[in-house]
């Protein structure tokens, strides 16, 4: 179910060069990665990825922007994004991505974009969705897209 939704998203977003998985990928992600060799995958483990070898958070640098990405359960994102933003700033990033709550969020505050795509499999606040973040010379545009 989850990998089918992921394939639909990647087929719809063919121009995407980077793909972020924010945890709870539960094992079927390796098959998806093999199907899209032209994309760069950035993956972190979530609270349901007990045997995962992926880190709980990581950093990517894309087009001059630092992207801190995590599932978020270790940073208490269910209770607010302050610790997430603090960790992203400490890492020199201007974009923070997280999951865990399965509730979408797009926020810009004090030079930091904070984005939660919701979930493509098990949303908690409405429709299944994902996020697209266009990074261009003239700015950053994050949007949530319903499936």
Residue ranges of predicted features:
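Core catalytic region of metal-dependent phosphoesterases/phosphodiesterases
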Residues: 1-62
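Residue-level detector of beta-strand structural context in well-folded domains
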Residues: 57-58, 104, 131
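Binuclear metal-dependent phosphoesterase catalytic core
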Residues: 4-7, 89-92, 108, 115-147
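Charged, elongated alpha-helical/coil segments that serve as electrostatic interaction surfaces
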Residues: 79-102, 135, 140
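Active-site neighborhood of phospho(di)ester-bond hydrolases with catalytic His/Asp-centered motifs
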Residues: 18-24, 42-47, 68-71, 94-100, ...
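Active-site-proximal segments of metal-dependent phosphoesterases and phosphodiesterases across multiple
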Residues: 49-91, 121-124
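Residue-level detection of beta-strand-connecting loop/turn positions
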Residues: 64, 111-112
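Active-site environment of divalent metal-dependent phosphoester hydrolases
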Residues: 1-5, 26-30, 48-53, 75-80, ...
């Amino acid at each position: 179910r989850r990998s089918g939704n992921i394939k639909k998203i990647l087929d719809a977003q063919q121009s995407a060069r980077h793909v972020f998985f924010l945890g709870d990928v539960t094992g079927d992600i390796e098959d998806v990665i093999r199907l899209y060799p032209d994309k760069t995958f950035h993956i972190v483990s979530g609270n349901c990825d007990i045997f995962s070898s992926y880190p709980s958070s990581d950093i990517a640098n894309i087009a001059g922007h630092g992207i801190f990405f995590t599932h978020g359960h270790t940073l208490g994102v269910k209770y607010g994004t302050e610790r997430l933003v603090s960790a992203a700033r400490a890492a020199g990033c201007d974009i923070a991505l997280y999951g865990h709550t399965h509730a979408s969020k797009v926020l810009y505050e004090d030079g930091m974009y904070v984005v939660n795509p919701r979930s493509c499999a098990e949303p908690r606040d409405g429709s299944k969705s994902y996020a697209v973040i266009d990074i261009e010379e003239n700015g950053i545009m994050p949007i949530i897209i319903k499936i």
